[in-house]
């Protein structure tokens, strides 16, 4: 079964982008490549249970098992040794990516406190978009009563767009609520 948003992308978004940017081929139109979710855990150094809680939260949000990220270098100021677990991340592609993006745009972002749209300035110059969420409880998959601590997470949306303008056009047409 094709995700709802992917169908919209193929039937509405690609033709609109082809017309706007005068692409010669359908393959030139920018598309979502992957979505990376990351929770950085500074407290994992003292509290190893924090890692398990963050892993289960991210697994519930993403629908697949996250990988534990480890410190590349030792940093004495942060009391971090090389190889210590300092976060969890998951990379979504294919149908899971489309369904997550759909949930993010239509359920999660509107549930944020004082939400007036996401900033246009969070593009990286290569058409990719990054956004941070302050708490994981805005996701409907997370049970509020089982949360031990509020953790933020980063969401990076990687597109094939060559620049920010085309990346913005793609995400805007897919329903991303930008504040203009």
From Swiss-Prot:
The keyword Glycoprotein does not apply. InterPro entries: Ribosomal_uL5, Ribosomal_uL5_bac-type, Ribosomal_uL5_C, Ribosomal_uL5_CS, Ribosomal_uL5_dom_sf, Ribosomal_uL5_N. This is one of the proteins that bind and probably mediate the attachment of the 5S RNA into the large ribosomal subunit, where it forms part of the central protuberance. In the 70S ribosome it contacts protein S13 of the 30S subunit (bridge B1b), connecting the 2 subunits; this bridge is implicated in subunit movement. Contacts the P site tRNA; the 5S rRNA and some of its associated proteins might help stabilize positioning of ribosome-bound tRNAs. This is Large ribosomal subunit protein uL5. One of its GO terms (molecular function) is tRNA binding. The gene is rplE. Belongs to the universal ribosomal protein uL5 family. It comes from Roseiflexus castenholzii (strain DSM 13941 / HLO8). Keywords: Ribonucleoprotein, Ribosomal protein, RNA-binding, rRNA-binding, tRNA-binding. GO terms for biological process: translation. The keyword rRNA-binding applies. Transmembrane segments: none annotated. GO terms for cellular component: ribonucleoprotein complex; ribosome. It holds the Pfam family Ribosomal_L5.
